[in-house]
Amino acid sequence: GVLQGIGASAGQVQGPVRVLTTLQLSEPIAPGTIIVVPYTDAGWGPILAQAAGLVAEVGGQLSHGAIVAREYQIPAVMNIPEATQQFQDGQMVRIDGRAGTVERLTETAAAGSLS
């Protein structure tokens, strides 16, 4: 399905999701990863620098995450309620930072791992 939020930094990217609810990273963010976060503030800057895209539960075009995403020229979609519960690590999504859409390309993380 496609979720509609607020487009905050233009561009399109598709890739795997990494859900982050805290700034404490257990492992580095892999290249090409789209991060899904509850909110952003100044502390998220170094993490955003590693991300290919951003989805946030709250915020708009003037929120910190949106401004930083534009600086780093990564697509960002804000205001997707409960995004951190709706997505799973490794799930493939496509985000459009102009239209403000987040499209699920796979329903669950690794479709190929069911044996």
State where each predicted segment sits.
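Non-catalytic, soluble scaffold/interaction modules
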Residues: 1-115
